[in-house]
């Protein structure tokens, strides 16, 4: 079996079949010459298919163990297409601490189509089992989750879903296929914001989807073409280039994050740390079972919640910005940034406090990052 370290470089369509180019060319075209009337070649129109995009789609399917991949103009575009598989009256079980954009899409957009949902703490399998209705068609979750780094048992949840004839939809953005393989654990569809670790350089907005079912692939392909939120060739090329160094980057992100999380856990200025690599994390054992390392994301709370503003503004190497997964370190406050679309009462109920801080730990020298955090904590 080929190692994923090799697959990120050689997987999918790694060379151009026409010219032999080692880097897949950017086919910057909207349409394609046909052989004759009613005689199209492999590609007809770039919304329906583009060679550069197709190479990326083949790559994500290869990395995740899917039968077909799909590249979208953003992570949310991919989520929208997947959730468009469902119809009025269908019920979705949604993890209670999903990304704010996913919650907004479900709560403000998809409910208008008649889809219904319930927010459920999926770390409690009894709560999950109790949440099923006759109309339940799918379970949707992230693991690790954004921003509380909750680790959910993909194998157990997938088995429960199958017992209820429901699909398991896993957002694998935080872990990437390098650290975690949801399809191998029973998931039906895997989604990514490729803007994050797959792209890896904060220079592209993209979404990727893959599935282990030919039937689902056919339906998703129809929706991708019909909705039209496809990824352009330039951006497809950028994501492919980013994936080539995924193994190197994820190992560096994970190593740096582990050391920072361990430091934060010992700091008197910090009251709580959320990182799956810590023995104190409630999902640590599950993470060890289904992940090869623990990733580059950390969330934590300061002992003095009033010190949050000073802390985030006193850092030198952690840029205050939304998004995550680039080579540079970022910091944000979910309650007023990435998760502001979730009502305050609901945010607090699920544990996203106003003072929660989220770090996207980059690949800089660990001594510089630790010094930066220590000095900012002392200045606050």
Curated annotation (Swiss-Prot):
It is an enzyme of class 4 (lyase). The enzymatic degradation of amino acids in cheese is believed to generate aroma compounds and therefore to be essential for flavor development. Cystathionine beta-lyase (CBL) can convert cystathionine to homocysteine but is also able to catalyze an alpha, gamma elimination. With methionine as a substrate, it produces volatile sulfur compounds which are important for flavor formation in Gouda cheese. The lineage of its organism: Bacteria, Bacillati, Bacillota, Bacilli, Lactobacillales. Its EC number is 4.4.1.13. InterPro entries: Cys/Met-Metab_PyrdxlP-dep_enz, Cys_met_metab_PP, PyrdxlP-dep_Trfase, PyrdxlP-dep_Trfase_major, PyrdxlP-dep_Trfase_small. Keywords: Amino-acid biosynthesis, Cytoplasm, Lyase, Methionine biosynthesis, Pyridoxal phosphate. Pathway: Amino-acid biosynthesis; L-methionine biosynthesis via de novo pathway; L-homocysteine from L-cystathionine: step 1/1. This is Cystathionine beta-lyase. Gene3D superfamilies: Aspartate Aminotransferase, domain 1, Type I PLP-dependent aspartate aminotransferase-like (Major domain).
């Amino acid at each position: 079996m080929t190692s994923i370290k090799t697959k990120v470089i050689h997987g999918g369509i790694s060379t151009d079949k026409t010219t032999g180019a080692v880097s897949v060319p950017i086919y910057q075209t909207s349409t394609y010459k046909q052989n004759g009337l009613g005689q199209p070649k492999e590609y007809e129109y770039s919304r329906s298919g583009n060679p550069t995009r197709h190479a990326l789609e083949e790559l994500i399917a290869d990395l995740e163990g899917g039968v077909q991949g799909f590249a979208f103009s953003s992570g949310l575009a991919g989520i929208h297409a997947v959730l468009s598989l469902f119809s009025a009256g269908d019920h979705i079980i949604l993890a209670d601490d999903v990304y704010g954009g996913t919650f907004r899409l479900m709560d403000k957009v998809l409910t208008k189509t008649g889809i219904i949902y319930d927010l459920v703490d999926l770390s409690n399998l009894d709560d999950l089992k109790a949440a099923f209705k006759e109309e339940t068609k799918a379970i949707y979750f992230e693991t690790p989750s954004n921003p509380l780094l909750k680790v959910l048992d993909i194998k157990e949840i997938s088995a429960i879903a199958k017992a209820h004839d429901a699909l398991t939809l896993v957002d694998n953005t935080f872990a990437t296929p390098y650290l975690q393989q949801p399809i191998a654990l029973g998931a039906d569809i895997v989604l990514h914001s490729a803007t994050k670790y797959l792209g890896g350089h904060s220079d592209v907005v993209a979404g990727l989807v893959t599935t282990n079912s030919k039937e689902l692939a056919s339906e998703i392909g129809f929706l991708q073409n019909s909705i039209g939120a496809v990824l352009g060739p330039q951006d497809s090329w950028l994501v492919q280039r980013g994936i080539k160094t995924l193994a190197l980057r994820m190992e560096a992100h994970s190593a740096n994050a582990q050391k920072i999380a361990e430091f934060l856990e010992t700091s008197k200025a910090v009251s709580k740390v959320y990182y799956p690599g810590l023995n104190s994390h409630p999902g640590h054992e599950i993470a060890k079972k289904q992940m090869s390392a623990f990733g580059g994301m950390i969330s934590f709370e300061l002992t003095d919640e009033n010190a949050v503003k000073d802390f985030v503004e006193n850092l030198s190497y952690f840029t205050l910005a939304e998004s995550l997964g680039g080579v540079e370190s970022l910091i944000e406050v979910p309650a007023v940034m990435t998760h502001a679309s979730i009502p305050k009462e609901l945010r607090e109920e699920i544990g996203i406090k106003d003072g929660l801080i989220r770090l996207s730990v980059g690949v800089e020298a660990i001594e510089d990052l630790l010094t930066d955090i220590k000095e900012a904590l002392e200045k606050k």
